[in-house]
Structures are given as C-alpha cells and as structure tokens.
Amino acid sequence: MSLLSKTRELNTLLQKHKGIAVDFKDVAQTISNVTVTNVFIVSRRGKILGSCLNELLKSERIKDMLEDRHIPREYTEELMNVKQTESNIDIDNELTVFPPENREVFLNSRTTIFPILGGGERLGTLVLGRVQDDFNENDLVLGEYAATVIGMEILREKHNEVEKEARDKAAITMAINSLSYSEKEAIEHIFEELGGTEGLLIASKVADRVGITRSVIVNALRKLESAGVIESRSLGMKGTFIKVKKDKFLDELEKNK
C-alpha cells in the first residue's frame, strides 16, 4: 500500500466522524493497520486514549496497563521529555514500549515516538512499536501526520468541553434565578437531605421539617427539571428519586446562598 493510500485510509476514518467525537480506539486501529505496528495514543498525563496491540498483548504488564487505562508515571515523564520524533528505539533504551523483562522475545523490536502537539502546547504522545523491521521514511511521514491529526481532534474535544461547561453554567444560573425565595430555600434543604447528587426524597418530610408547603417543593423541582438541571422520577409511596444532571449545580447553589 502506498503512502498516499495509507493517508487516505486515515482521512476516511476522520471524515466518518465529522461533527462528532472521534473514537481514538478506531484511530489506533487504523494506524496499526497501515503501519503494521502496536499503537498507543497517550494523553500528557499518561491516560491511554486509544490502543491497538498485537504482540504486546503477550505481556502481563501491558495487559495490566490496558486494564488501568494508564501507562506508568515514570514512562509518561520519559515520553513528555521527547520534544521531536525519535525513531527506531531498541529494546535496551528506556523509551522502548516493549517490556524489557521479555527482552529475548522482543530483541529486534523498534519503537518510534511522535509528540502530539496542538495550539502551541504538548497534548500527548503517539507511540508505535514493531517486533522487527525498522521504521522507514514513509512510516515517519505517516506517523507525524497521524500525530498532527490526533492533536487537532484533542483540541476540538477540549473546545467542545469548554463550550458545554459554559452552556451548563448559563442553564444553572438561569434555573437558580427563576426560583422564588421559598423555592430556593426548599431546594437547599432538599440537597442537604440527600447529601449528594442523587437520592430518594420524601417531599412531605422535608416540608414538615422546614415549615414550607409541599407545593413549593414540587414547583421548585419542576423548574429545575424543565431547565435540564435535574431529573426526577416518582416512586409512588416511596417518594421521588432525584438526580443532578449538571455537575456544577450544587457548587452554584452553595455560592447563591
């Protein structure tokens, strides 16, 4: 397969995901297919965003890493110290992705490391490993292209997260401001009663304890639910199950006391 064909295969995957978050497992699988390598896509803090492994699955240590979804802290630091592509690293180098304890099995292995950059900052690392055969110039071109594309996708996801947080905060602020004084007081007592972000509420008990009517509690919950801040489900005589949908709601409620 030519370099152009391999690049197009990666592009095809990205076009399928246009407008939605890319699954980095799929990206790792595609990179593995076109480069015939074991692949790790790792965040700057060592979280495994995506991987596609073949020979490396023989290692118990690698299996444990996949289960934890993290690579060791020491190796993460070593990767973050790599500022530009380093290719054809052998098994005796501390940057090898292959387990040194299995040196005999991976004696001819080669590791290549591609820093993932975006927006002027280091976002993570693309690590490719082969049991044998050096990485050639075409492999390096493809790897650097893949690292660039991954960087763009990570930045896009970060941007989407920031936008979502802003929308959520606006929705929470509007919902809290829509409550009357007594409704706001009722909500504060409800979440004190729940002691967390979800739980079972018996409205009549809260109403009696605080000295407000049950209708105030019902109206307050209805306003928050219509704003998408909470969800509630009646369980009949048992009460009402309540769950917070917006992560920052309780923090904002505390600030508005």
Swiss-Prot record:
NCBIfam families documented for this protein: codY_Gpos (TIGR02787), PRK04158.1 (NF003170)
GO biological process, one term: negative regulation of DNA-templated transcription
Keyword terms, alphabetized: Cytoplasm, DNA-binding, Repressor, Transcription, Transcription regulation
DNA-binding region residue numbers: 203-222
Region (GAF domain): 1-155
Domain of life (superkingdom): Bacteria
GO MF, any single term: DNA binding
Keyword Transmembrane helix appears in the UniProt entry: no
High-level lineage: Bacteria, Bacillati, Bacillota, Bacilli, Bacillales
Role: DNA-binding global transcriptional regulator which is involved in the adaptive response to starvation and acts by directly or indirectly controlling the expression of numerous genes in response to nutrient availability. During rapid exponential growth, CodY is highly active and represses genes whose products allow adaptation to nutrient depletion.
Subcellular location: Cytoplasm
Protein name as it appears in the record: Global transcriptional regulator CodY
Family: Belongs to the CodY family.
GO cellular component terms, semicolon-separated: cytoplasm
Source organism: Staphylococcus epidermidis (strain ATCC 12228 / FDA PCI 1200)
UniProt-listed Pfam families: CodY, HTH_CodY
